[in-house]
Amino acid sequence: MVHWGEVKRMKIEVRGNQVILDGYVNVVDRESRMLPSPRGYFKERIVPKTFEKALKKAKNVDLLFNHDKNRNLGSIENGNLELYEDNIGLRAIATVTDEQVIKKARNKELRGWSFGFVSEKDSWEEGESGVQKRSIEELELLEVSILDMTPAYVATSIETRGENTAMIEMRSEEAAVKTVVEDDTEERSTLIKQIKKVLEGN
C-alpha cells in the first residue's frame, strides 16, 4: 500500500556544488481537488500510461525553475533530468548545479514539482453534484519545474506554436520536502583531519 504522504515527498540531497532532487511530479489515476476553468469548477485525473506515451513521443523535456524559460536548469537531452512513469505516477530525478537553486535547497526554500503540458486527448463527464470530471488520456509534456513558491495547482498560458495557438496548462502540488546536506559532514571530517595533522606536526 502506497501512503500519499510518502508519494508527495521531494527528496533533496545537497552534495558540494550540486543538488539532487527526486520525487513524483504527478500521481496518475488520482482525482485532483476542485480546479477552476471558464466552464466552471471540475476535477481532473491523468490516466495511467499517459506520461509513458508522452515521454516516448517527446524529443526532449526541459527542466525549469518556476516555469521560467529564462531559468533553464537542464533537460533529458542534457543528461541531468530523468523522467519515467511507474505504477504511482511521473517520477523525476534531477541533478542541478545552479547556484541559486543550491542555495535555496540549503535554506529549505524549495516547495515541490510542477509540469507544463498541452492536452491532446481528454474526455469529460458529469460527476456528483453536477461537478464536471476530466480524464486526460494523451498529452504533450513540455517541461517540469522546480518551485520555490507555494504552488497554485492550476495555471494556463497561451502560446503561438508555428501556425497554431496552443493552450499550455500547468499543474503543481506542494511536496513534503526532505533535505539532506551531505557535504556538511564531509567538510566537518576534512576539518577534523586537518586539525589532527596540525596537532601531530606539533
Question: What does each model-identified segment do?
Answer:
Residues A175-N202:
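Terminal short linear interaction segments
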Residues M1-M170, K178, E182:
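Signature of dsDNA virion morphogenesis modules
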